[in-house]
Structure formats: C-alpha cells, structure tokens
C-alpha cells in the first residue's frame, strides 16, 4: 500500500506511487497495467464463479476497519499512503469522510466503497470452488484473520450474493477458531489447507499446515472425479470432453477446460462460439466459453465476432461479460 513502480518486459509500466493496487498483465508479463487502485495492504485475490475479483485489505489502525472489496477495472477504493500520517490534530479524508465504510448517501462519489467491513487482519483468502464441502458454502469466500493472538484469530466465511452490479454479504460466520492462520486454499482432493503461524508475536520459530475435510463429503464421487480431472493430461482431451467440462461443478475444472480451449488457438473459435451462442448450454459453460474467446482475441480478432449479438442475450451475466470483453 506504499506504492509501486513496475515495468513489464515490453516496457509497459504500472505506476502507483502512493497506494495499493491490483495489476494485470499477460502470462508472459507483457502489457502490464493498473487494474484497480486505492487499496491498503490487500491480501490475496479470488475470482467468483462469475469472474468478479474480490480481495480483503487492512486498516490503518486509527479507528477504521478492514474491508472486503469488489475489485473492479478502473475502480478506486480510496486509500492513499498520506492518510497514514495526517497533519497534527487533523483527520485525513480517509477518516473524516469515512472512505473505509460501505457506501451511504454521503460517501464520496469517486470511490468504489467496500462490500462490507470485516474482521481484523485479513491475511489470505480463497473462494469455494464448488466441491469438497456441503452446498451451504457455495458462493463463499474463506478469509484468514491474523490478529497475533491464537484466541482472537481464525478463518471466517463470507457468503457473497450479487446486488445490482456489485455484491452484498448474505451471511458471515467463524469457520475455524483458536488458530493463527496466515493463508488458506482448497486442494484438488477437496480438503481446505491452511498455514498456521503457531505461536503469535513475536516471530514464531515454527509453523504448521492443517488440512480440513468434511467426512460426509470427502469420498463423494464428484470430489474424487475432480481430483482425477485436475491431475489429468489436458492436452489429450477432445473438444467434446472439454465442452462437457466447461459446465463442471468445480470452478478449477471449468478453468482448466477454458484455458485448454484457449491454448489450442483459432481452431477453438468455432466450438466456443457454438457453446456461447446456444441458450441450451449450461450458464457456466457459456461464461467460460466467453472468457476463452476473450483469451483468443488478441491474436484472433474474429473470436469477438459473436459477442455483439450476445449484448442482447437473455442472460444478464452473459451480457455483462460480453460488454467487458468488447470494452477490453
């Protein structure tokens, strides 16, 4: 959150001298750019199943609170490093104008307010991929809250629901307590893995990694299938197999199918167009087909041809993603 000045191998520049930000580039580092700005010590990033980006950032310890942020292209979440050191006896705009709070009628119009304020010390996060636990966790973000004390720290879940063009929290609750987790991720085996600091402040001399599973779902056929699919050689998958897997219950499998289509180049445009243009295709299959077409577009502009028609699609998410891709 104290700024960055980074160059890509092609000379592209991301320059944010006084704020935390999210950057975007091609897999080879080219076309580096600032995607969103105004964050304070953001910790990790996670995509929802609709392709929206979320993060948690930290407060400045002056009476403000941590935030769950919907990271939007071109968005400004309000933080500047100068707010950490305001003039004596003067509140910075961060505090005086309550820029850290969710939007109200008095919020500055130029910033993208957080979805909500959250527990102290977000240090890592992950989004439930769709397999491994029970269905109550669908749409949930898992955030580790590192507060320096075992008694106060843990993992919380935040169930996010679309609200207009943004998100709202439907529910939040503790998932794991009496631990000092620093990060959290779902493994291909359906278990939730978390790194643990162990002893609190000062610096710990040991650490642990825990694996958490639901015994009622650990051996589900879908969990075992997901583990096998993630480990498979995707280069050998046929077009028909990839088409089916674009609609898989697990987000990671859908992404593998999407990226495999994209890696095959222009030959994928026809099958992807057929998927995304058919109202009978599963909703997630259509979205991942759209994103694969977007990946192909820089070298194959014809990949975007179907998208103009999709701006009038009956599915609002298909319309939204088509507009984003065309705007890029």
Where are these regions (language model features)?
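Short inter-helical turns and helix N-cap capping residues of alpha-solenoid HEAT/ARM repeat scaffolds
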Residues: 249-250, 280-282, 314-315
């Amino acid at each position: 959150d104290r700024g960055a000045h980074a160059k890509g191998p092609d000379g592209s520049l991301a320059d944010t001298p006084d704020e935390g930000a999210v950057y975007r580039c091609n897999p080879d580092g080219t076309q580096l750019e600032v995607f969103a700005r105004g964050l304070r010590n953001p910790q990790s990033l996670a995509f929802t199943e609709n392709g929206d980006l979320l993060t948690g950032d930290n407060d400045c310890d002056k009476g403000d609170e941590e935030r769950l942020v919907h990271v939007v292209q071109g968005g400004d979440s309000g933080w500047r490093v100068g707010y950490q050191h305001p003039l004596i006896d003067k509140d910075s705009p961060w505090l005086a104008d309550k820029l850290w709070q969710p939007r109200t009628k008095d919020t500055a119009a130029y910033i993208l307010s957080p979805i909500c304020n959250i527990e102290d010390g977000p240090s890592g996060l992950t989004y439930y991929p769709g397999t491994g636990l029970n269905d109550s966790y669908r749409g949930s973000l898992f955030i580790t809250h590192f507060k320096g004390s075992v008694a106060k720290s843990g993992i919380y879940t935040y169930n996010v629901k679309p609200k207009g063009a943004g998100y709202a929290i439907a529910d939040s609750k503790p998932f794991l307590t009496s631990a000092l987790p620093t990060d959290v991720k779902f493994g291909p085996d359906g278990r939730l893995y978390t790194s643990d600091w162990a002893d609190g402040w000062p610096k710990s001399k040991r650490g642990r990694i825990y694996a958490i599973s639901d015994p009622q779902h650990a051996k589900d056929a879908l969990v075992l299938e997901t583990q096998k699919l993630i480990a498979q050689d995707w280069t050998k998958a046929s077009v028909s197999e990839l088409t089916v897997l674009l609609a898989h219950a697990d987000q990671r499998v859908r992404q593998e199918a999407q990226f495999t289509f994209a890696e095959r180049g222009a030959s994928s445009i026809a099958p992807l167009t057929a998927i995304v243009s058919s109202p009978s295709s599963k909703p997630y299959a259509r979205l991942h087909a759209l994103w694969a077409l977007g990946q192909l577009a820089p070298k194959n502009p014809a990949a975007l041809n179907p998208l103009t028609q999709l701006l009038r699609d009956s599915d609002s998410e298909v319309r939204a993603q088509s507009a984003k891709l065309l705007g890029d």
